[in-house]
Amino acid sequence: MSQSAMQEITCPKCGKKTSFLVWASIITMENPEIKEKVRNDEAFRFHCPECGASALLNYNFLYHQQEDKVLIYVSADGGDTSDMAQILDQRGNAFDGYRKRIVRSYNAFKEKLLILDAGFDDRIVEIIKSSVWDNVEAHYKDKKIDEIYFATNDDGVHGFLFRRAGEMVASMEFDESLYKAIYDSAYERLDAATKNDLYIDRDWAKDVVERMG
């Protein structure tokens, strides 16, 4: 079941202490209203009743979207995730057939949700993003891009956002024809080789491209 607890939060602006609901695990079928609040950040946004300041709180939690068989563990503090990886890697339980992921930041978690909502496979998206990274480093190193994220705008158009020091500096449209070409030509082989992989990120993409050729 979903697990949460009230914790005392100190406002970063005025210093007032206020109770805030912190989630250890979220199950969307038990809390349907939380699904949208996760996506618009309100599930994790602290609002100070004293001064009106707001802040997005980053902490570790497990996200369970049961209706789509998705489990994502968010290691927002960047700590060791080996214990959670061992748990998620277990077989022969109710989570067989799930898409299980471990991400190391809140932004990476939000990206996984956007990819899920768009109906794409995050492994193929990550492989495409890896080639985008290669192009950026070969031709635009002076731009000092340090993050690239999949995103969807208000019109439903998918793309990649390029960030530097936390600020968006550029974007490009997502090539759905390339996605389809990779899916059609390599999905079965990719799925057979990586079905149980938990960490689907840039390092994973570089490794799997080298392995699969």
Residue ranges with predicted function:
Residues 13-17, 35-37, 69, 100, ...:
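Context-gated lysine
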Residues 47-132:
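Domain-exit/linker segments immediately C-terminal to small folded modules
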Residues 133-213:
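C-terminal, charged low-complexity interaction regions
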Residues 31, 40, 58-60, 93, ...:
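Detector for Asparagine
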Residues 1-77:
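N-terminal cysteine/histidine-rich coordination modules
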Residues 33, 105, 173-175:
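General structural signal for secondary-structure boundaries
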